């Protein structure tokens, strides 16, 4: 079983913790990671883009000049794509970009992402994470002690105090354990996670 150190908010190591090898020491599947990240980004798209084709642009119903005898190139409508204010060729229309990924692949990708953080020594386990009140200064001091500039903080439950303490810090994001996703795990350089959150993740993915 992989073992990691457990730290307090001051950055001091207080204990060691064994991790579930089925979750944090799994085989890294790059194909699954790619498929899930592509799907997550595609599913974020609104798909509301819309421009007009030549049949939808107002005007242009009359031929601008006769077919022959003017010396100019033949034209059928002033709303053809080559004209200023003409329609758009293959105009983008509203569409659904949603991509479905099998649940088993999502699970493999999640284990791969968590394993990569452990292997790269980028996962920091905290014994607890609580502040008396929302204070950005307290969060900055903790991040400095843990040497984390760009980090994803995972808590066991939604914690408004922790969230408010971190929301004004660039490169830091806070999410509860039940909302983690592969994209966020890979996007941030370091993963800061509480012991309770580790247990929750192991319950779901082990």
Swiss-Prot record:
GO terms for molecular function: rRNA binding; structural constituent of ribosome. It comes from the Bacteria. NCBIfam families: rplD_bact. Keywords: Ribonucleoprotein, Ribosomal protein, RNA-binding, rRNA-binding. Residues 47-77 are annotated as: Disordered. Belongs to the universal ribosomal protein uL4 family. Part of the 50S ribosomal subunit. Coiled coil: none annotated. One of its GO terms (cellular component) is ribosome. The gene is rplD. One of its GO terms (biological process) is translation. This is Large ribosomal subunit protein uL4. One of the primary rRNA binding proteins, this protein initially binds near the 5'-end of the 23S rRNA. It is important during the early stages of 50S assembly. It makes multiple contacts with different domains of the 23S rRNA in the assembled 50S subunit and ribosome.
């Amino acid at each position: 079983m992989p073992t990691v150190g457990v730290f307090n908010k001051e950055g001091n190591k207080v204990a060691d913790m064994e991790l579930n090898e089925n979750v944090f020491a799994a085989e890294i599947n790059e194909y699954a990671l790619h498929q899930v990240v592509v799907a997550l980004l595609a599913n974020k798209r609104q798909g509301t883009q819309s421009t007009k084709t030549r049949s939808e642009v107002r005007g242009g119903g009359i031929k601008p000049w006769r077919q022959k005898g003017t010396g100019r190139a033949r034209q059928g409508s002033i709303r053809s794509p080559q004209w200023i204010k003409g329609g758009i060729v293959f105009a983008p229309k509203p569409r659904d970009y949603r991509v479905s990924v099998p649940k088993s692949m999502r699970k493999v990708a999640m284990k791969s992402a968590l394993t990569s953080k452990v292997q790269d020594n980028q996962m920091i386990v905290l014994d607890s994470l609580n502040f008396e009140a929302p204070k950005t200064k307290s969060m900055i001091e903790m991040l400095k002690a843990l040497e984390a500039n760009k980090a994803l903080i995972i808590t066991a439950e939604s914690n408004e105090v922790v969230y408010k303490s971190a929301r004004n810090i660039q490169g830091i994001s806070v999410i509860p354990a039940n909302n983690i996703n592969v994209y966020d795990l890979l996007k941030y350089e370091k993963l800061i996670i509480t012991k309770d959150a580790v247990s929750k993740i192991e319950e779901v993915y082990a």
